[in-house]
A protein has these predicted regions:
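A detector of single, family-specific signature residues
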Residues: 1-301
């Protein structure tokens, strides 16, 4: 660029500064760095960081289920979920069936009552201990130690994820985007969608956003062969694709118009995932229109 401005072979700091300034001023498409750009970058970093942390926590929870199946397999049928504060408190102190079987009933009752905020009482403690005494679980100190450490790591991740979500909430409250007026979209899901899309002015149409998320149908044609059942491309931002699909599930649950639209596609004989992809495309069109106009969501009557 510098050589195109002059035939003279001059290289000084003053000339360089003038050249850089001229190049920047000549770019008509260049936009100044705004608060919106800053918020988008911050949101993208935070939401992707949270995504990775949640994924890491999910793996640890699978490890807990595996270890409980070895140490006290009957426990899973006694509680709504293994991943509850009361169950984690129990397994932290008594990680195996043999530990629970030999525990004092008073101590067991106090632990369960305190960790469940009074939900579990003496009868539950007695039930757990009796199940532990007749359990087929193995007594393996190494696995018990692994279970305690895994639960500790999950608790640490819970605290980290909560801290990340608080930072996300602060930024979202400053932006106050229209997307949050759609029933079923929380600040976490809305933040990830906004962060991954970024500036909506970069996209000429909602279809461009769908292509960016890898949600457009693939095309294959060779001679007389034409694909009748086009598969999704699944390219682009996997974070955006994941966020849009999860958001669509919740919106279809909470918004009557989306719920009926999903039911209509299912009635046409479409597979659930195919019907959900149609609802996701409809959601993207609505989000695009809302963000471009700045208007809140108006439910269909």
């Amino acid at each position: 660029y510098r050589k195109s401005l002059s035939l003279r072979k001059t290289k000084t700091d003053k000339v360089d500064a003038h050249t850089i300034t001229s190049m920047i001023m000549s770019d008509v498409n260049l936009k100044s760095y705004s608060d919106t750009s800053y918020h988008n970058e911050e949101l993208k970093s935070l939401t992707r960081y949270r995504f990775d942390k949640v994924k890491e926590r999910a793996k640890l929870k699978s490890s807990v289920s595996r270890l409980v199946c070895i140490l006290f397999p009957e426990l899973e049928k006694l509680v709504p979920s293994l991943h509850m504060a009361s169950v984690y408190a129990l397994l932290t102190e008594f990680p195996s069936a043999s530990d629970i079987a030999s525990a004092h009933l008073t101590r067991l009752t106090h632990l369960l009552s305190q960790s469940s905020k009074g939900h579990y009482k003496k009868d539950t403690a007695f039930l757990f201990r009796e199940a532990a005494r007749s359990s087929i679980g193995s007594h393996m100190p190494a696995k018990s130690l692994e279970l305690k450490h895994t639960i500790k790591l999950i608790r640490e991740l819970d605290a980290e994820i909560n801290e990340i979500e608080n930072e996300i909430k602060i930024i979202i409250n400053e932006i106050n985007p229209p997307i949050l007026t759609i029933p079923g979209i929380s600040y976490r899901m809305g933040a990830m969608i906004l962060a991954e899309i970024g500036d909506f002015n970069r996209f000429d149409s909602p279809d461009k956003i769908l292509a960016y998320a890898g949600m457009s149908p693939s095309t294959y044609q060779s001679g007389q062969l034409d694909n009748c059942y086009a598969h999704m491309e699944k390219r682009g931002s996997r974070y955006l694709r994941d966020a849009l699909y999860n958001a669509t599930k919740y919106v279809c649950h909470w918004d009557p118009s989306f719920s009926s639209y999903l039911a209509q596609k299912r009635a046409e004989g479409k597979h659930y995932n195919v019907a959900l992809s149609h609802a996701a495309k409809k959601l993207v069109r609505i989000i695009y229109a809302m963000e471009k106009s700045g208007q809140s969501y108006i439910p269909a009557r």
